[in-house]
Amino acid sequence: MSGDPTASLKDYQLLELDTAAGNDQAPQLPTKTVLGFTPPLPTLPQPTELVYTKRRRPKRRSRCRCLCFTMGMFAMGVLMTTTLLVSTFVLTVPMVALRTAPCPAQTFGLGDECVRPVSLDAYNSSNSSEIGAVCGAYSEMPAPDNTTVLIMNLLDCLNIGINESAGEKLNLTDTPLANCNFSQNSVCSRKRVGVCYAARPLSPLGELIYKARQALRLDHILPFLQ
């Protein structure tokens, strides 16, 4: 027992030592490499135009929305400014400034009014209402006496140095009436004359504004614009 180094070991330990010694002395067997199938690695797609478009599409959409919003706000601003300017013009322009249409036939313009000389020979009464009846037939008003004298004198001055009478130029039905002033002339002294007047007609723009005010019922609110 003293000469054997393994005498103190147990049986299972001796078995392990024998097995390990046998493995060391056994020849190494050749190993065989088994080839297996490995799938190829996926290749990255090339950056084509389609891929570039997909990447840029969100940015283009955001730019398009921003542009549409800007254009919409600009159009709204232009529309609101135009509406404000037109409304201000319609509400503030005086109607006198829009009476620029030519006077009707057989009348002539004096400022903002159209004047019509008329003959009163067909009326026998001396009542002042007869001139009102004559002017009322034309939807006009009779002028005061002093205005009538001034207008008839003006017509007489227009005939000085002119071969064609003022009555023919003014398309008056009673041509001798235009040549008469209140003088001692025998022809003129037998004539009874009068003058009717009315506001000058509205221009097409004035008629449009007047109708707009009537539609909005602003005539009684803005009487100073008449």
Swiss-Prot record:
Residues 1-63 are intravirion. The chain crosses the membrane at residues 64-86. GO terms for cellular component: membrane; viral envelope; virion membrane. Disulfide bonds: none annotated. Belongs to the herpesviridae HHV-1 UL45 family. This is Envelope protein UL45 homolog. Keywords: Glycoprotein, Membrane, Signal-anchor, Transmembrane, Transmembrane helix, Viral envelope protein, Virion. It is found in: Virion membrane. The keyword Transmembrane helix applies. Residues 87-219 are virion surface. It is a single-pass type II membrane protein. It comes from Equine herpesvirus 4 (strain 1942) (EHV-4). Glycans are attached at residues 124, 127, 146, 163, 171, 181. It comes from the Viruses.
